[in-house]
């Protein structure tokens, strides 16, 4: 049954509960229930629909994130460690059903069988097997982190597509192929069986023909390198997974013993853009982490004395372009978009000047309350959209000090230095009002039509809390915002779904899963008109859900 959309309480400004002054907050509500273990709901639950869901909106919103944070007496330390919980909101002719299932990864099954944490995760070192003797437990510390058997297959970050099939992935060498109808794992895939990489990102890019590109790492006896990966669009055999994948370019790290940690990369029609940022992975610390009784995350540190470097690769030839582009230190977890214009690559990112966010996402921090929670939030960096310009054809005769950007519509500059490098200064794609929203993350665009092209709009979550507390539409041309927020609710990454056949950049709807720590309220799937950012409807589900990471919409 569909119900008229009632008037819900919204934030219209600062309240006595929360006061935001340029990122400084007091009185943040505790969100610990959003970061605790929940039960799966494998049988479809009919949602109570308020307002309306467009009749053309037929398909499934798939989401994934951590949903279990302990086994027996063992507890995970970091938000990124929780066991993968798959969510499905299925929409058909205005009705909505929900289900969720824990991914039956080898890690999940081994932990469940032993009732303890058997496999180490990003921020948690597995406990030694109590059934082994002292010598066996000691020797188990010497298994290298890069070895496939030592890596988790708890793929809890994103759904990705290769050759028409969907996979769950994180940043290790393992992916899990999934049946998007049943949410059941069908196959475990190891990247390293096909190409020489130890892992790849959870944010590949796609050409219109389905060719996929990704960034990975190679870590072995010959050192460390970043890898650009290409996966062909078509299967030769129905049983294929990532067969035919190729490494088309290898990039040596600027600092051999301390390569950069990265979460995503950029792509235009012709180029891959990879950013080496001063969030460093200390290879010695990582290689000796088990011996020292430390988790993988102990080997990652923010080193703001180092600048950020941009690498540009021709994705057709695999050639690394000679330009040496640098900027002041920042961290970017998510790229917004990138495109080419007048001999330049323009790249838009969500950037933070404080790279300690991985430390902030320790579960003990996220679950704090009162003044301690305020202190954690106020110590964290904020993420803001910035534009950089990378001129591709730099003349050796270009005078030192010249701004090499020919683009009149951006204040981003690229200035040639005496040593031939190019110093890139960004343009802010926002005004002061976004600072009052706590910045923005989880950026999304109309990917199918505007990825790698000049664009105007993107969508994301505002962060006046440690998790997203609003949805925001950003106009990067006029630098204006539209905001949706509701008191006591926390929306997930927005997913843009276009009206069938449209080429309009905001011609469609935004889907977001909105959850609350209040046990007397229902979580819901929200649908907004992407143009005016007004609510069209919501589908309430009386099921506890944790705050997750990423997802995708798959039309029927």
Curated annotation (Swiss-Prot):
Localization, per the record, is: Mitochondrion
Q: What class of enzyme is it?
A: oxidoreductase
Signal peptide region: none
GO terms, biological process:
carotene catabolic process; carotene metabolic process; lutein catabolic process; lycopene catabolic process; retinal metabolic process; xanthophyll catabolic process; zeaxanthin catabolic process
Print the keywords alphabetically.
Dioxygenase, Iron, Lipid metabolism, Metal-binding, Mitochondrion, Oxidoreductase
Cofactor info, note text: Binds 1 Fe(2+) ion per subunit.
Enumerate the catalysed reactions.
Answer: all-trans-beta-carotene + O2 = beta-ionone + all-trans-10'-apo-beta-carotenal; 5-cis-lycopene + O2 = 5-cis-10'-apo-lycopenal + (3E,5E)-6,10-dimethylundeca-3,5,9-trien-2-one; 13-cis-lycopene + O2 = 13-cis-10'-apo-lycopenal + (3E,5E)-6,10-dimethylundeca-3,5,9-trien-2-one; lutein + O2 = (3R,6R)-hydroxy-alpha-ionone + (3R)-3-hydroxy-10'-apo-beta-carotenal
Pfam families, A to Z: RPE65
Q: What is its main location?
A: mitochondrion
Q: Where are the transmembrane segments?
A: none
Q: Name one GO molecular function term.
A: beta,beta-carotene-9',10'-cleaving oxygenase activity
Cellular component GO terms, alphabetical? mitochondrion
- Annotated residues that bind Fe cation are located at 203, 263, 334, 550
Give the E.C. number(s): 1.13.11.-, 1.13.11.71
Cofactor(s) needed by this chain = Fe(2+)
Tell me which InterPro entries the record gives.
Answer: Carotenoid_Oase
Superkingdom of origin organism: Eukaryota
**Protein function:** Broad specificity mitochondrial dioxygenase that mediates the asymmetric oxidative cleavage of carotenoids. Cleaves carotenes (pure hydrocarbon carotenoids) such as all-trans-beta-carotene and lycopene as well as xanthophylls (oxygenated carotenoids) such as zeaxanthin, lutein and beta-cryptoxanthin at both the 9,10 and the 9',10' carbon-carbon double bond. Through its function in carotenoids metabolism regulates oxidative stress and the production of important signaling molecules.
Q: Indicate the family of this protein.
A: Belongs to the carotenoid oxygenase family.
User: Per its record, how is this protein called by name?
Assistant: Carotenoid-cleaving dioxygenase, mitochondrial
Gene that produces this protein: BCO2
């Amino acid at each position: 049954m569909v119900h008229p959309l009632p008037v819900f309480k919204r934030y219209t400004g600062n309240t006595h509960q929360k006061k935001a002054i340029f990122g400084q907050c007091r009185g943040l509500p505790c969100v610990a229930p959003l970061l605790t273990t929940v039960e799966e709901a494998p049988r479809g639950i009919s949602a109570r629909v308020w307002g309306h869901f467009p009749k053309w909106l037929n398909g499934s919103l798939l989401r994934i994130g951590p949903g279990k944070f302990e086994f027996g007496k063992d507890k995970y330390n970091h938000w990124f460690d929780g066991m993968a919980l798959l969510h499905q909101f299925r929409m058909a002719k205005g009705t909505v059903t929900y289900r969720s299932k824990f991914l039956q990864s080898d890690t999940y099954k081994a932990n469940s069988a032993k009732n303890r944490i058997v496999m180490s995760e990003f921020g948690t070192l597995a406990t030694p097997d109590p059934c082994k003797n002292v010598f066996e437990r000691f020797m188990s510390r010497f298994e290298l982190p890069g070895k496939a058997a030592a890596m988790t297959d708890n793929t809890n970050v994103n759904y990705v597509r290769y050759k028409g099939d969907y996979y769950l992935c994180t940043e290790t060498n393992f992916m899990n192929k999934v049946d998007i109808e049943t949410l059941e794992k069908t196959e475990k895939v190891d990247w390293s069986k096909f190409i020489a990489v130890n892992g790849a990102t959870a944010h590949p890019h796609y050409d219109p023909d389905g060719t996929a590109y990704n960034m990975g790492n190679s870590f072995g006896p010959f050192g460390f390198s970043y890898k650009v990966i290409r996966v062909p669009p078509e299967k030769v055999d129905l049983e294929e997974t990532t067969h035919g994948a190729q490494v088309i370019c290898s990039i040596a790290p600027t600092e051999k013993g301390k390569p950069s940690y990265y979460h995503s990369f950029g792509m235009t029609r012709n180029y891959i853009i990879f950013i080496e940022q001063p969030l460093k992975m200390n290879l010695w610390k990582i290689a000796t982490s088990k011996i020292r009784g430390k988790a993988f995350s102990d080997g990652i540190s923010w080193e703001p004395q180092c600048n950020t470097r941009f690498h540009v690769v021709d994705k057709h030839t695999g050639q690394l372009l000679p330009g040496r582009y640098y900027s002041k230190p920042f961290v970017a977890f998510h790229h917004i978009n990138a495109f080419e214009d007048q001999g330049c690559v323009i790249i838009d990112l969500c950037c933070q000047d404080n790279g300690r966010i991985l430390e902030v996402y320790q579960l003990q921090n996220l679950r704090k309350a009162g003044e301690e929670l305020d202190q954690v939030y106020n110590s964290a960096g904020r993420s803001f959209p910035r534009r950089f310009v990378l001129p591709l054809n730099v003349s050796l005769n270009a005078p030192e000090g010249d701004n090499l950007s020919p683009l009149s519509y951006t204040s981003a500059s690229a200035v040639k230095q005496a040593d031939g490098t190019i110093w890139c200064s960004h343009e802010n794609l926002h005004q002061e009002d976004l600072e009052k929203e706590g910045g923005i993350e989880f950026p999304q665009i109309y990917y199918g039509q505007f990825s790698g092209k000049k664009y105007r709009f993107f969508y994301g979550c505002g962060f006046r809390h440690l998790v997203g507390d609003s949805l925001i539409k950003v106009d990067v041309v006029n630098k204006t915002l539209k905001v949706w927020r509701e008191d006591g609710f926390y929306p997930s990454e927005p997913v843009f779904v276009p009206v069938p056949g449209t080429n309009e950049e905001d011609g469609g709807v935004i889907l977001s899963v909105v959850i609350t720590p209040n046990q007397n309220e229902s979580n819901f799937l929200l649908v907004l008109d992407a143009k005016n950012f007004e609510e069209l409807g919501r589908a309430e589900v009386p099921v506890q859900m944790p705050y997750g990471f990423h997802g995708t919409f798959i039309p029927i």
